[in-house]
Amino acid sequence: MARILGVGRSSASSLNNKEDNESDVALLSPKDPNRVHTKEQLAHPASSNLDPSMQGLPAGLSLDDFIPGHLRTHIGSSSRGTRVPVIRNGGSNTLNFQFHDPAPRTVCNGCPPPRRDGSLNPDPAWYQTWPGPGSRPSMSPKPPASQHAQNWSATWTKDSKRQDKRWVKYEGIGPVDESGMPIAPRSSVDSPRDWYRRMFQQIHRKMPDLQLDWTLEDPPKVVSARASSAEPRHLGTLQRPASRPGTTETSSGRNWNHSEETSRNTFNYNFRPSSSGLHPPNQVPRHREKVENVWTEDSWNQFLHELETGHKPKKPLVDDPVEKPAQPIEVLLERELAKLSAELDKDLRAIETRLPSPKNSQAPRRPLEQPGLEQQPSARLSSAWRPNSPHAPYFSSSRPLSPHRMADGGGSPFLGRRDFVYPSSAREPSASERGSSPSRKEEKKRKAARLKFDFQAQSPKELSLQKGDIVYIHKEVDKNWLEGEHHGRLGIFPANYVEVLPADEIPKPIKPPTYQVLEYGDAVAQYTFKGDLEVELSFRKGERICLIRKVNEHWYEGRITGTGRQGIFPASYVQINREPRLRLCDDGPQLPASPNPTTTAHLSSHSHPSSIPVDPTDWGGRTSPRRSAFPFPITLQEPRSQTQSLNTPGPTLSHPRATSRPINLGPSSPNTEIHWTPYRAMYQYRPQNEDELELREGDRVDVMQQCDDGWFVGVSRRTQKFGTFPGNYVAPV
């Protein structure tokens, strides 16, 4: 007996199996030589000579499936409605089916079919069509081709060794629900492929849209070229034939050769899409057009091939439509880089419009090598130095404070302007730079400024200036320092020491009036005063003060009798004994004609006091910050009415810094020399520059000059060296 592959287990009851076995035994003819052998096989299945694969068959099998057709009795045609095909083994790839009689009878065509009776004639569609061992094919005539065309279909196993015929319950894909999904099992329909196709489309109809290779030239066209090329074949298969090729063969046991089986194999099955799932090319639904276009005939055949064989496909079912760029990546990168470069250039231009021109901030230091600066309009320079400009220096109405004042706890008690931190960007001008001056035309194009205070240079890079001088600004070193030129000399100076002149004003230097001290005044300190500024004079209670001039009604300028300390102080701290007498002169400062005899000895060493830049408008009505919080009684003595007493600034008597020898004061006093004044060091001082003098406590120092910044110039008797040192480190002997 031939080997049957893939026969599944049955779910029928044992009672039905027993009835089927009894009916199968009754179907055997008495004259059949195989009847006795068949009975023995049924009675002793373990000792039968069946194929080993047939031993231990499921109990749901009946002998109708194994008895040749010419030995079977007729079975009523009504049993055809009770045969329901069921897929076993989880839907194996061989697509083999097991037929059983369900327990509750199903309704077929509106009426319940009768129970199968073994005494009735069997339907020829239910017995096997392949010959058994030793048997010959039946020579019975073939029925008409259309007799069972709608009642059965063929299914082949994978090894192509045999064929089986089964009953078909539904035509096409069978009934569907309201959404279009098939209801009947796939094994009970006439077109399982169409059934599977419809089932797949209904399950995946909401799947994400697949990316297709759309043509950019024709936007309304949504069907790809590959899908449109397959449409003629789809349209040509809309008219399905009434029966499939080869289904009209009779069941008279013809021999199946391998060539015929291969031509009718499911692997070579011609894909025929269902007419219910197709639409005209111009009426493709929006939600299904991409799925229809992607799953072509070849894709479906390959997908079903993989489903039946379980093998991996050689190529993807649907080509992954990788979106290719319209242009090469190099072109896109170059375009993006050009766009970024354009944006960067735009931002840089916007920044350049908001910032000053680099020619202003990076002008050459040499005046003769500035062609770009000469060609700049004065309007731009004036706008750069407006008070509301972000680069405009801060102009104070009073003399600027010292940048640093040492704390009481350590370091030098007072170093004055020696503590200035000069900008590192300004290099020392050479002699050629200081000696070279631009032309008058160049000076007019530069911005001019007038000095508000005297400025004494402390390093070669600085420029010594006096109040009222005109200086031409070359550039701004930083927010605190400017670089400019005065009388051919180039250097830096503080920005808050100058006042920038308007463009329409002619730069003309203003010299302060010169006063001659006719008679020095006299005062006695009633309270101890400690100055907070360089120009302020500190004294103790009871010290006598020589008055030089009256700055205004609240401030006096004077010096401590017997010392070289000089400065301004509030009038409320002293008792005025005698007001100083001054005289305005145009020829320069002169010594008093008849000085006080009590102060002659002291005036000899201080005949020309250092200049202190004091503006009466700056000091009027102002007190020291530290003194403002110190309560003291106001005992201001009314000054005596004198015509020589002035409320205007006093004389500004200045002279250049002293050298190592006594300095001749010039033609105004040709016979006057500065005498040395002995001082004693009160504190130890370590020099910080080469021109400074080392002091130890108790050293004797001969002071030659007292500078306006609080520093003294003299010679140490211990080291016999000449230099400068802070004046508050020493005291007069």
Curated annotation (Swiss-Prot):
Annotated compartments: Cell junction, Focal adhesion; Cell junction; Cytoplasm, Cytoskeleton
Subunit structure: Interacts with vinculin by the first two SH3 domains and the proline rich region of vinculin. Binds to SOS (guanine nucleotide exchange factor of RAS and RAC), through its third SH3 domain. The formation of this complex is down-regulated by phosphorylation of SOS. Interacts with SAFB2, INPPL1/SHIP2 and SRCIN1. Interacts with DLG5 through its third SH3 domain. Interacts with SOCS7 and MAPK1/ERK2. Interacts with FASLG.
Composition-biased stretches (Basic and acidic residues): 32-42
Gene name in the database record: Sorbs3
GO molecular function: vinculin binding
PANTHER family registered for this protein in UniProt: SH3 DOMAIN-CONTAINING, VINEXIN
Annotated region described as Disordered, given as residue ranges: 1-51, 129-165, 224-285, 352-448, 584-672
Positions with biased composition (Low complexity): 597-613
Disulphides: none
GO biological process: cell-substrate adhesion; MAPK cascade; negative regulation of transcription by RNA polymerase II; positive regulation of MAPK cascade; positive regulation of stress fiber assembly
Post-translational modification remark: Phosphorylated at Ser-594 by MAPK1/ERK2 during cell spreading.
Chain segments carrying region Binds to SOS: 674-733
Protein name, UniProt field: Vinexin
Keyword Transmembrane helix recorded: no
Transmembrane helix listed as a keyword: no
Predominant cellular place of this UniProt entry's protein: other
Gene3D superfamilies: SH3 Domains
One GO CC term on file: cytoskeleton
Keywords: Cell adhesion, Cell junction, Cytoplasm, Cytoskeleton, Phosphoprotein, Repeat, SH3 domain
Role of this protein: Promotes up-regulation of actin stress fiber formation.
SoHo domain ranges (all copies): 164-232
